[in-house]
């Protein structure tokens, strides 16, 4: 099985919260797709709570689109990582890490402005596979943490995993 790009970076050297260009690719029609690693937690030291990450998934996708879409950028998807330390965001375009960081911080402020759980989008059994597994309070604590710590940039060159550690 091929080694995925996300496993070629040294997770012990990642900063969080931090944005990283995980991958870029060009479609046959010439569009650039960029995948960003939006790392909320320091790997193997912190983890996002399941209800909070789920609520954040519902809120973050819309708020990031509000702040980042336009001028050659269109978000395709924002999905939580299985390890619960962040999200992957795939988009058409090539925004800078700073543009993404600014949109992320603005989105976290938007999360703090949500007044109650009934305002979480798609919070019903028809649109959500686990609609009872939510916590606005946990999502807001995650947002507060990001705002307090700011958003750094993780660079692939700084995180390149030593080949001797691959499959260790």
UniProtKB/Swiss-Prot annotation:
In terms of Pfam families, this protein maps to: LuxS
Q: Which InterPro entries match?
A: LuxS_sf, Metalloenz_LuxS/M16, S-ribosylhomocysteinase
Alphabetically sorted, this entry's keywords are: Autoinducer synthesis, Iron, Lyase, Metal-binding, Quorum sensing
Top-level taxon in the UniProt lineage: Bacteria
Describe cofactor binding as the record notes it: Binds 1 Fe cation per subunit.
Q: Name one GO biological process term.
A: quorum sensing
**GO molecular function terms attached to this record:** iron ion binding; S-ribosylhomocysteine lyase activity
Q: Which cofactor does it need?
A: Fe cation
- Enzyme type, top EC level: lyase
**Annotated Fe cation binding sites:** 54, 58, 128
UniProt catalytic activity: S-(5-deoxy-D-ribos-5-yl)-L-homocysteine = (S)-4,5-dihydroxypentane-2,3-dione + L-homocysteine
The keyword Metal-binding is annotated on this UniProt entry: yes
This entry's Enzyme Commission designation comes to 4.4.1.21
Return the NCBIfam families for the record.
PRK02260.1-2
Q: What does this protein do?
A: Involved in the synthesis of autoinducer 2 (AI-2) which is secreted by bacteria and is used to communicate both the cell density and the metabolic potential of the environment. The regulation of gene expression in response to changes in cell density is called quorum sensing. Catalyzes the transformation of S-ribosylhomocysteine (RHC) to homocysteine (HC) and 4,5-dihydroxy-2,3-pentadione (DPD).
Q: How does it assemble?
A: Homodimer.
What the record says about family reads:
Belongs to the LuxS family.
Which PANTHER family does this chain map to?
Answer: S-RIBOSYLHOMOCYSTEINE LYASE
Q: What is the name listed in the Swiss-Prot or TrEMBL entry for this protein?
A: S-ribosylhomocysteine lyase
What is the species listed in this Swiss-Prot or TrEMBL entry? Neisseria gonorrhoeae (strain ATCC 700825 / FA 1090)
């Amino acid at each position: 099985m091929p080694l995925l790009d996300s496993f070629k970076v040294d997770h012990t050297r990642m900063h969080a919260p931090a944005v990283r260009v995980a991958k870029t690719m060009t479609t046959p029609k010439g569009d650039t797709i960029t995948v960003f690693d939006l790392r909320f937690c320091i790997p193997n030291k912190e983890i996002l709570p399941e209800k909070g990450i789920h609520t954040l998934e519902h809120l973050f996708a819309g708020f990031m689109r509000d702040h980042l879409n336009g001028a050659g950028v269109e978000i395709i998807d924002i999905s939580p990582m299985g390890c619960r330390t962040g999200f992957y965001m795939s988009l058409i375009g090539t925004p800078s890490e700073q543009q993404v960081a600014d949109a992320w911080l603005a989105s976290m402020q938007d999360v703090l402005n949500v007044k109650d759980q009934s305002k979480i989008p798609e919070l019903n059994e028809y649109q959500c596979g686990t609609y009872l597994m939510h916590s606005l309070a946990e999502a807001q604590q995650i947002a507060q943490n990001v705002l307090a710590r700011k958003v750094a940039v993780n660079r692939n060159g700084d995180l390149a995993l030593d080949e001797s550690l691959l499959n260790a």
